[in-house]
């Protein structure tokens, strides 16, 4: 009896020490913006299986971060506005990625399902307010509203009007997955049809076959990547079937305006839209338009986006212009070249993608950095020698080798600056030198990664991580 008591006491002391070292970083229950029973149950199911205390702690902190701190669900309107984190605006890209891992849990949680449907409807609404905007205010507040010249007066609902292809891709990706999981086709109503028509019109206009179109972007700034060359139109492109993206998912201006990862993403979501239009809406004409555009862009990618590299062989360029010029790099923000195997799983086995994957994680990529704190891909948005954990997570998502997955997880656990969250970026030699302490997308993405590895039977890999 005495031995049992001592054993229990030692166990309690160990738990107390662990709690002091790894305190709960979530808001108090009454301060959480949205509560999902399914999410809480998933955390309680998975966390005890993680034997590494720091990994368990970070999973508990990160996975619910989007619903804890950024989701504003209005049950009366049925719409959901999602902050990106420390910036109180809704990016179409970020919001679609932030709530993505909750979709698989919503079939048994009606409250969660309604909130997710609200995100989708909100995104469709925002696309139709301004198809060229990347981020929006919570209402017609006129907040932010830089004195940008973009070809039209900025709507007060718009936070920023940077044309990025992925702003149209993420909402369709989310809606399609929601439908796959729930079978709820109510989101594919007249607003959906209007949204697809808007996307098609914007994509075809930005193929630049009939001139430059109505959009340009000029900003008075000391950051070269916050404005476009050639009086806001960007460098010339040859109309070869690809779609112009004036800005990257980092919100930096493109150098050559055919952004290859985003064009691949566009092909994928156009085909998803075509499936819905056929199976749900029975709209053969609109479905055919989506398929035709997808086929055209895909053919152009095969012809213009592949470059022969002296070390890695045939790889995908990051940006091209249709004239034969290409930019050989990768940026951490998704969609990136590295992330194509994550966003479009069918590409993971593509030999050109595999060559590209090796290229981007090497010194041949000007934005690959390696230092005392870790290694990974950054981008010009923050500056040189700065790594984005998003790239490390994309490497883990697309890895098949257990040692590679383990190395990625150990890096992620070592570079939280002791705070239990994933940051936007950190210096390659000092993880305490980081940007954005509250960036919900990266936090929830970390939770998504842990869940994927558990579901893929990689719990032993997670539990082999030694970082404390």
Where are these regions (language model features)?
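Solvent-exposed loop and edge beta-strand segments that line ligand/cofactor-binding
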Residues: 22-35, 80-95, 108, 154-166, ...
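Bacterial Sec-dependent N-terminal signal peptides
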Residues: 1-21
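Low-complexity, Ser/Thr/Pro/Gly-enriched N-terminal "stalk/linker" regions
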Residues: 20-93, 118
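Aromatic-rich carbohydrate-recognition surfaces in CAZymes
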Residues: 88-116, 120-225, 440-454
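Extended ligand-binding clefts on enzyme/binding-domain cores
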Residues: 92, 128-132, 139, 200-267, ...
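Extended, well-ordered alpha-helical scaffold segments
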Residues: 58, 110-126, 185-204, 273, ...
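C-terminal capping/lid segments that line or modulate ligand- or cofactor-binding pockets
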Residues: 150-156, 161-163, 327-349, 385-468
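Well-ordered alpha-helical scaffold segments within catalytic/enzyme domains
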Residues: 38-51, 97-110, 170-185, 264-283, ...
């Amino acid at each position: 009896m005495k031995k049992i008591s001592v054993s229990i006491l030692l166990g309690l002391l160990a738990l107390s020490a662990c709690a002091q070292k790894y305190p709960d970083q979530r808001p108090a229950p009454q301060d959480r913006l949205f509560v999902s029973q399914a999410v809480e149950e998933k955390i309680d199911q998975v966390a005890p299986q993680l034997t590494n205390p720091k990994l368990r702690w970070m999973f508990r902190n990160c996975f619910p971060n989007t619903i804890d701190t950024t989701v504003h669900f209005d049950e009366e309107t049925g719409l959901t506005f999602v902050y990106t984190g420390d910036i109180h605006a809704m990016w179409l890209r970020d919001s679609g990625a932030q709530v993505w891992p909750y979709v698989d849990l919503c079939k048994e949680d009606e409250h969660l399902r309604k909130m997710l449907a609200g995100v989708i409807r909100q995104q469709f609404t925002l696309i139709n307010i301004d198809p060229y905007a990347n981020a929006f205010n919570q209402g017609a507040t006129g907040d932010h509203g830089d004195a940008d010249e973009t070809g039209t007066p900025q709507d007060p609902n718009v936070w920023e009007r940077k044309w990025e292809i992925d702003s149209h891709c993420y909402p369709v990706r989310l809606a399609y997955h929601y439908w796959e999981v729930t079978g709820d086709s109510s989101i594919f109503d007249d607003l959906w049809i209007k949204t697809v028509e808007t996307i098609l019109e914007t994509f075809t206009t930005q193929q630049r076959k009939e001139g430059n179109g109505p959009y340009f972007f000029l900003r008075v700034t000391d950051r070269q990547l916050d404005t476009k060359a050639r009086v806001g139109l960007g460098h010339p492109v040859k109309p070869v079937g690809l779609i112009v993206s004036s800005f990257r998912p980092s919100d930096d201006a493109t150098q050559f305006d055919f952004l290859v990862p985003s064009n691949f993403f566009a092909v994928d979501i156009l085909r998803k839209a075509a499936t819905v239009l056929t199976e749900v809406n029975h709209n053969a004409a609109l479905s055919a338009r989506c398929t035709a555009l997808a086929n055209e862009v895909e053919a152009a990618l095969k012809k213009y986006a592949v470059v022969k590299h002296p070390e890695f062989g045939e790889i995908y360029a990051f940006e091209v212009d249709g004239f034969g010029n290409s930019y050989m790099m990768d940026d951490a923000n998704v969609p990136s070249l590295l992330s194509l195997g994550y966003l479009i799983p069918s590409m993971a086995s593509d030999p050109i993608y595999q060559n590209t994957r090796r290229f981007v994680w090497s010194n041949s990529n000007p934005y690959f950095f390696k230092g005392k704190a870790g290694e990974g891909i950054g981008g010009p948005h923050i500056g040189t020698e700065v790594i984005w954990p998003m790239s490390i997570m994309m490497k883990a998502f697309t890895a098949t080798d257990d040692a590679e997955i383990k190395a990625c997880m150990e890096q992620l656990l070592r570079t939280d600056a002791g705070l239990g969250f994933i940051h936007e970026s950190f210096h390659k030699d000092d993880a305490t030198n980081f940007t954005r302490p509250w960036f919900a997308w990266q936090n929830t993405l970390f939770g998504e990664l842990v869940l994927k590895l558990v579901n893929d039977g990689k719990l032993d890999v997670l539990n082999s991580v030694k970082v404390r």
